[in-house]
Amino acid sequence: MCIRDRGTALEDGLVLDATIAASEAQRQALWDVRETAPESHKMSAGVARSDISLPQSALAPFYDEMVTGIRAIDPNLWICGYGHIGDGNLHFNLIADEKSNVDFDSKKKDLYELLYEKVAKYNGSISAEHGIGQTKRAQLAKVKSPEILDVMRAIKASIDPKNLMNPGKVI
């Protein structure tokens, strides 16, 4: 999104609060905050990470519904969302502190189910930049149609008809 678009988004009321760098030093300081966020999560009592994408028009309602759902599961979780919002890519991470760390691992299943349900509702993707991997493979069938899954298999078969390259992996 260019500077003009940011100004328009602010003027049109699409953005209610923003920090826009006025200098190169401020731009770098903002970028440093974004770059150090994943490292800071390691110091928390627990984290549930995600890398999703959504249509831009769905970002605000998705976020609002997620906050409501997350608070019902654990009101003490910290929500850390950042990413390439102009592209609809969002790192939506849930961070446990000492209050929410009790059985956090058992809560992760419910948190991820909520996340994937909302991503599917808004026609998003459960993986924006980092692929499906083994951890999201079971969720793929819940958020993609059988036709899309067939196309994905056909693409893999056309590249690797003998299934020699990364057998069982998703393209």
Functional labels for PLM-detected ranges:
Residues 19-32, 127-142:
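Short proline/glycine- and acidic-rich turn/helix-capping motifs at secondary-structure junctions
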Residues 18, 81, 128, 165-166:
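General beta-strand structural signal in soluble alpha/beta enzymes
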Residues 4-107, 114, 118, 122:
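C-terminal substrate-recognition/cap domain of FAD-linked oxidoreductases
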Residues 120-132, 161-165:
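Alpha-helix capping/hinge segments and adjacent helical runs
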Residues 85-90, 126, 133-135, 170:
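Gly/Ser/Thr-rich beta-alpha loop segments that engage phosphate groups in nucleotides
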Residues 56, 60, 109, 142-149:
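Electropositive phosphate-/nucleotide-binding environments in soluble metabolic enzymes
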